[in-house]
């Protein structure tokens, strides 16, 4: 007989009828007993790959501790229920050991085009994604993508559990690690801004160089070009569109500089710090520069 059969996939499927055998499946997605079943814990990493960690550190020219910290930043961070240990993405982790390089291994196995279409369809505020709050019923829902894209994005592995309010049964979500966050935000850029997929990585590089050298004129000229050729459909959601583009740009710049980004009542406040310069910016729709300085 079969003692334990394990089925895994991306999103949940519905129970087709009251007579279906599939109705007897036990969903273990958020069960504490199984939180480590699909990944690698920090303890397992050090107990089984300690020699490889030292070799990886030597290849990268890093100390052992810094290498471990960077691995955790890039590939750790998955939590499948509240108050659970962090889990490494095994595919990315093992490829990093294989090539001894920090790459976007899992992200490059598939493109989240469908998820981006969901976000745009529902006019989703991208800044909210980093601190979305919801309950277990929504996270485990099957067809809620028709009104809410978050369950599908969570089930696909682009968001994970970051915190839990036990009193209200509310989960706080966020990106699990840098590989997923940077990869997903980079993927979003051509879908929201006036830039093609080939040029996108170079545009981010130019943004960073311009703020680091104090060339703010070129920086803002490049930023304005991202809003060119905005379609009529987008104009109807103009304020949200501008906020989303600015969020993407400064989130990407923030991977290489220090950025504090806040939104409030149609206004965006930003502090951007490099080694030589500190920029304080305020963006306001349908307002003048003088009004923003008040």
Give each language-model segment a name.
Residues 225-258:
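Acidic-basic catalytic patches of nuclease active cores, encompassing PD-(D/E)XK
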Residues 285-294:
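Catalytic cores of nucleic-acid endonucleases
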Residues 2-3, 152, 265, 276-278:
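Coil-to-beta-strand transition motifs
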Residues 257-276:
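Catalytic centers of nucleases
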Residues 246, 270-285:
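Conserved catalytic cores of phosphodiester-cleaving nucleases, focusing on short active-site segments
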Residues 1-238:
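Phosphate-binding site recognition
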Residues 151-159, 247-251, 255, 294:
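Metal-dependent nuclease catalytic cores in nucleic-acid-processing enzymes
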